[in-house]
A protein has these predicted regions:
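Short beta-strand->loop
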Residues: 100-111, 132, 246-258, 267-270
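Conserved C-terminal helix/tail region of periplasmic/extracytoplasmic solute-binding proteins
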Residues: 324-354
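Ligand-binding pocket segment of bilobal, Venus flytrap-like solute-binding proteins
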Residues: 169-173, 177, 181, 189-253
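Ligand-binding "clamshell"
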Residues: 94-101, 121, 126-130, 210, ...
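Short, low-complexity disordered leader/linker segments with a strong preference
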Residues: 1-33, 354
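Hinge/lid segment of periplasmic solute-binding proteins
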Residues: 70-71, 87, 91-137, 150-157
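Mature extracytoplasmic/periplasmic domains
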Residues: 267-327
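Early extracytoplasmic/lumenal segment of secretory-pathway proteins
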Residues: 26-92, 221
Length: 354
């Protein structure tokens, strides 16, 4: 889901953790802050800036999926100060009492610089915006090669077009693949109606002979290299691949899609709460948010940072900063409970086994 360029953050990245971004493993003069974030989802230079300006050492750990992150936070064996979960996982963490309410007086940049529309979107999973500050956001849409696709796609059903057989890329992701199939049929991406889920399952099974591959990060290289005609992609990745291959374009299908938001939260057992607040406030500073946007290319909800973008095309990019009011049926993924997760897992196994 996140930016993939294989840069090493602050040196050697191990399979478990990054034990600090400075030259020494010792805590800074004002202590430390332990951050757990998606891989390649922050400009390393901003971590150095934070350390230099505050005297707080950043201890940095990375995860690949929300489902890998959650049990580590839940177990409490690794006490993190700041974590960056996605929308539905924020809701799950709230319901299971794993994160604490934020004091916006301690993070004034979050209050002043994050656009109201993003807080409104986030309220679907964080009522009252009590627990989470939006960090990045985006959509899921169709990426396509204009030299290989005759007519620009407008519907999710275009991913079932037989003329693109073996040239279609789908996401190796339960939530995202089912979102596509559910939206194709006019259903909610958060549906727990088994008749609707069965229809979506049947569609995904019927599509399988047409699909070249179920991918995550590989979709970028394949689309850049012209190895596929059409596929599913996150908007932030679309910005990157279009920059690498101008034959590519991105569209949100008319049936609607998922609008996702990742944000900063503070776990209940955070050992350095004050430093966590300073870190979140720093990341919401316009110049810092701009650096992170330019590094990871995912849309920033920081409206003050957007005003600092010098490239007018990027500043007004309909992909990076979509006008969501022009689309119908946009939804944020919600946490559907353990029974809901088991239901989606059951139907996904049916798709994969047929």
């Amino acid at each position: 889901m996140k930016k993939f360029i294989a840069l090493l953050l602050c040196g050697i990245l191990t399979a478990t953790a990054l034990t600090g971004c400075g030259s020494s493993s010792a805590a800074g003069e004002n202590g430390e802050v332990i951050v757990y974030n998606w891989g390649e989802y922050i400009d390393p230079e901003t971590l150095t800036m934070f350390e230099e300006e505050t005297g707080i050492k950043v201890v940095y750990d990375e995860f690949e999926t929300n489902e890998i992150m959650y049990p580590k936070v839940e177990a409490g064996s690794s006490a993190y100060d700041v974590v960056c979960p996605s929308d539905y996982m924020v809701q799950k963490m709230i319901e299971n009492d794993l994160i604490q309410e934020l004091d916006y007086d301690k993070i004034p940049n979050a209050k002043e610089n994050i656009g109201a529309q993003y807080y409104e979107q986030a309220a679907a999973y964080d009522p009252g915006n009590k627990y989470c500050v939006p960090y990045c956001w985006g959509t899921v849409g169709i990426i396509y090669n204009k030299t290989m696709v005759d007519t620009p796609p407008t519907k999710w059903a275009d991913l079932w077009d037989e003329k693109y057989a073996d040239n279609i890329l789908m996401m190796d992701s339960i939530k995202d693949s089912f979102m596509v199939a559910l939206k194709k049929n006019g259903f909610s991406s958060n549906s727990l109606d088994e008749s609707e889920l069965q229809i979506a399952t049947n569609d995904l099974i019927a599509q399988k002979p047409l699909v070249q591959a179920y991918v995550v990060d590989q979709v970028r290289d394949k689309m850049i290299g012209g190895e596929a005609a059409i596929g599913v992609m996150f908007s932030g990745d679309a910005i990157y691949v279009i920059g690498e291959n101008p034959d590519l374009d991105y569209v949100i299908p008319e049936e609607g899609t998922n609008v996702w938001i990742d944000g900063w939260v503070i776990p209940k057992n955070a050992p350095n709460k004050e430093n966590a607040e300073k870190f979140i406030d720093f990341m919401c500073r316009p110049d810092v948010a701009l650096k992170n946007f330019e590094y990871i290319t995912y849309g920033t909800p920081n409206t003050a940072a957007r005003e600092l973008i010098e490239d007018e095309d990027l500043k007004n990019s309909p992909i990076a900063f979509q006008d969501l009011t022009q689309y119908n049926n946009l939804e944020t993924f919600l946490y559907l409970g353990e029974d809901g997760e088991e239901l989606f897992n059951k139907y996904w196994k049916e798709v994969m086994s047929n």
